[in-house]
């Protein structure tokens, strides 16, 4: 399998974060049979440890958490009005993922402050987490 070949390359080139980033990306692809968030996080963390100034791993981890949060928010919004307890539970769970995403997106923004997509993602996270002063500062 290609993933095994890339893992082998990552082991042979342990100072090159690109292989870990590629493996993380493969595991984080929801369309893939290899989709596995935990494995993706392991490889993204390795990529960050090897190259802490490469924004891509930070962006990808943040995006994984943001996607999980968004899915929960969408699920909550589809509930009937009388399911407010389930709604509150889903929103609370989404907040946990937003909180997990925040340091990764903040670091990505620190590394590439001119990237409008990262800026918007960070602004959205700040708004969801009710950090309005920080959200407004990014306008």
Residue positions per predicted region:
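Canonical positions in the second alpha-helix
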Residues: 9, 46-47, 108
């Amino acid at each position: 399998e290609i993933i095994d070949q890339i893992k082998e390359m990552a082991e042979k080139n342990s100072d090159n974060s690109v292989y870990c980033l590629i493996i993380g990306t493969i595991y984080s692809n929801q369309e893939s049979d290899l989709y596995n968030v935990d494995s993706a996080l392991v490889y993204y963390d390795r990529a960050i440890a090897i190259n802490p100034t490469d924004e891509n791993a930070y962006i990808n981890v943040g995006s994984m958490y943001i996607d999980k949060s968004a899915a929960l928010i969408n699920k909550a919004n589809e509930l009937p009005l009388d399911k407010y307890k389930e709604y509150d539970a889903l929103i609370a769970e989404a907040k946990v993922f937003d909180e997990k995403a925040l340091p990764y997106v903040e670091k990505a923004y620190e590394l590439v402050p001119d990237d409008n997509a990262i800026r918007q993602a960070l602004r959205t996270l700040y708004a969801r987490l009710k950090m309005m002063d920080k959200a407004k500062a990014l306008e």
